[in-house]
Structures are given as C-alpha cells and as structure tokens.
Design a protein with these regions (language model features):
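Domain-level signal for soluble alpha/beta catalytic cores
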Residues: 1-156
C-alpha cells in the first residue's frame, strides 16, 4: 500500500520501468490521492518508442492529463535513452529525467562490459542534459564510480 510508505515518511514516489502509459496513469493517480509527488519512468526502445509501441507524442498526451512531477526514461541502453529523449524533450515542458543501464540482459542474468565505462557514460549524460534532462542517474550496471563522475561534473 502506498499509504504505508507515505505514513512512514516517503517524500516522493518513483514509479519506474513502465512499458505503456495506462499502467503509469494508475500509479500517478494513486500518488496524487495521497498528495504525494509522482515521478514516472518509461522504457524506450531503439526507435524511441516505448516497448509497448507508444510514441513519445502519445506518452506526452497521456502524461499531460496526469501530470507527473518528473517524467523519466530508464532501464534501457544509453542509445535507446537518447533516441527517446530526442523525441520526448521537444514535446514536454516540465522536468525530465534519465537513467540508463550499461549492461545487457541475457537470461537468466545481466552481463556487464566496459562498453560504457564511467567516462563514456558521463559523456552521454552531458548530451542528455543538453537535451533538457535535469534529473540524471544510473540504472543496472552503473556503480558508485559512475555516480561520482556525474556528481563531480554537474556540481561544478
């Protein structure tokens, strides 16, 4: 129950890794009923659409009706995040966030490589910031080293 988290002192709800807007709409509504901020994250595919097939324009239409406090793209490779953000950012005038993963899921486990080391990830994050993302972090495969690099750069 979200009420339990709110009663325990949660200050926001981050609902993440949605593949379509209907499931996100339910989550936002639940948070709003508790008068809590709702941060919502969607998973983009390589063409910038959600895994469920919706375009970013369709996401914006649905989210404009529901008003999340921050709209994120997450749990996808950096290239997919970029593709989604390039489509989303021009359409959304409220806070945007991103956090990519730097591995590949090969069931039953994740495989992490040096394809996106902390420095390369920082370069992607700079680009995302230039596109309009103001809340930036890391998902699966990122480590404290990645977040330290982000903190050092963005706190200058």
């Amino acid at each position: 129950e979200l009420t339990d988290y709110a009663d325990a002192g949660a200050d926001i709800f981050l609902f993440e890794t949605f593949n379509s807007t209907p499931e996100a709409e339910v989550a936002i509504k639940a948070a709003k009923e508790l008068k809590m901020p709702a941060w919502v994250a969607f998973v983009p595919y390589q063409d910038g659409r959600l895994l469920g097939g919706q375009t970013m324009a369709e996401v914006v239409d649905a989210m404009a009706r529901n008003e999340p406090d921050v709209l994120f793209l997450n749990c996808a490779p950096p290239e997919h995040i970029t593709a989604g953000l390039e489509q989303l950012a021009p359409l959304w005038d409220k806070p945007l966030g991103v956090y990519a993963h730097v591995g590949k899921f090969n069931p039953p486990e994740w495989q992490f490589t040096d394809d996106y080391n902390a420095e390369k990830y920082l370069q992607e994050c700079k680009h995302w910031h230039d596109l309009g993302a103001t809340v930036i972090g890391g998902c699966c495969g990122t480590t404290p080293e990645y977040i330290k690099k982000l903190t050092e750069f963005f706190s200058q």
